[in-house]
Structures are given as structure tokens and as C-alpha cells.
Amino acid sequence: MKRSYQALEPTLFFLMLMVIWEISARMIGQPYLLPSPIQIVMRTIDLSESLFFTHLPATLAIISIGLALSIVLGILLSLLMFWNERVERAVYPLLVASQTIPVIALAPIFVLWFGYSIWSKVAVTVLLTFFPITVNTYDGLKSTNRQYEELFYTMGATKRQLFYRLFVPSTLPSFLTGLRIAVPLAVIGAAVGEWLGANEGLGYFSRRMMTQFDGPGVFAPIFILSLLGILGFAAIKKLENILLPWRKKQ
């Protein structure tokens, strides 16, 4: 009974927020400033063909390519830093420095370099997502129990066996944690990139609706972007429960 109530708590809190939002929007009475949730849903339905068949696929492509590149870059960088201390001393500060630069300032530069092609938006997405993947994977490699490593060597394991039988399983929880953080950031990166320079995508569509003072139209793609982030986060969490069942029990 207690678990059922705990599972219900987030839903009740969300519904309470929606009721407060609906009442506040009706009291203000200016949809172009603060549309109500019902108005946003109705506008999403009205614009569904354009949103779901033109702009959503464009945004999903940016998110998918950006995440894939971030995973590859993150794993390669974390392995290089783990295997070579000089690389770690040289690269790690640059990783941290890359996160101190506002993405909103770099996005126009990417548009200047890559134009309105998909790659300017992918660059923004990679900039936001590769850091948590790299750092978490590297920390996972560093936290591998050295006693287990010595035990593997004592039992005659090769370096290849050591990597796949020890380092990969011990690093997987940290990698998945980084990926879980990166997925919502990928949605943000795609939206920011589209907002600043694109001719299609949910971020672009939201900006276009803003120029028309269409409040519900501005929020409609934001609503879809939020759902994408939540679904992506939940999918990685589900993958964690499948690959790491002991963590779910804990």
C-alpha cells in the first residue's frame, strides 16, 4: 500500500501543478503570455500534422546523431585518460573548461561554421552531452577495485579478458548514469540549436510561433520536447534495471 502511494505521489503533484497553472492562466486571461495547459494541448492537436511529421523527425535526428557522437567521443576520451596520465592531465581541464562557456554564445558560431545544416545543431548537442558521459565513464574506470584486478592477473587473465570481464562491467553503472543525464541535455541542445539557426525542428517551430504572438503555439513544441526528455530518461532508467538488476533491488 505504501509503495502504491509513493508511486502515485508524483502524478498527484503534477496534476496539482496543472490545476494551479490552468487557474492562473484563466485569471490572467492573456494566452499569448501564459496559455493554459488545455489551450496548449488543443493547439498541439491543431498543429499535429506539422509538429509530428515535419519538425519532430528533424529534432529526433539531431538528438540521435548528437548522442551517438557523444557516446563514441566520451568512451574514447575516458579510455585515453584512463590509460595515459599525461592525456588525463591535458584533457580533463579542457573538458571542464568546455562546460564554462555558455552554449547560447557558441550556437551562433556553429551556425556560422556549418550554416543551417543539421551539423550546427548536432555540434550544440554534442557540446552539452559528451561531458557527463565522458566524466562518468572515466570515474567508473578509475573506481574499479584494484584487488579484483590483481586477482584476475593472478588467475592468468590477459589484458583483453581483464578489460571485458572486469572494467566493462564495473564501469557500466557509471556510464549509464552519465547517459541518463545526457539524454535530457540532448533535447535541450537540439532545441537551442534549432531556436538560433534552423529551418525546421521543434525549437525552430516554437520561435516561429513566437513571432506570430501565438502563445499556445510557442508552448506546443516545448510540451513535446519535455515529453521527449522524460521518455528518454525513463528509457535509460529501464535499461539500467535490465542490465543492472541488483541496483533496482538496492
Curated annotation (Swiss-Prot):
What is the name listed in the Swiss-Prot or TrEMBL entry for this protein?
Formylaminopyrimidine transport permease protein ThiX
| Transmembrane feature ranges | 5-25, 62-82, 94-114, 115-135, 172-192, 216-236
Sorted alphabetically, the keyword list is:
Cell membrane, Membrane, Transmembrane, Transmembrane helix, Transport
Compartment annotation: Cell membrane
Its Gene Ontology cellular component terms are: plasma membrane
Q: How does it assemble?
A: The complex is likely composed of an ATP-binding protein (ThiZ), a transmembrane protein (ThiX) and a solute-binding protein (ThiY).
Stated family: Belongs to the binding-protein-dependent transport system permease family.
Matches recorded under Pfam families: BPD_transp_1
Name the pathway it acts in: Cofactor biosynthesis; thiamine diphosphate biosynthesis
Q: Which InterPro entries match?
A: MetI-like, MetI-like_sf
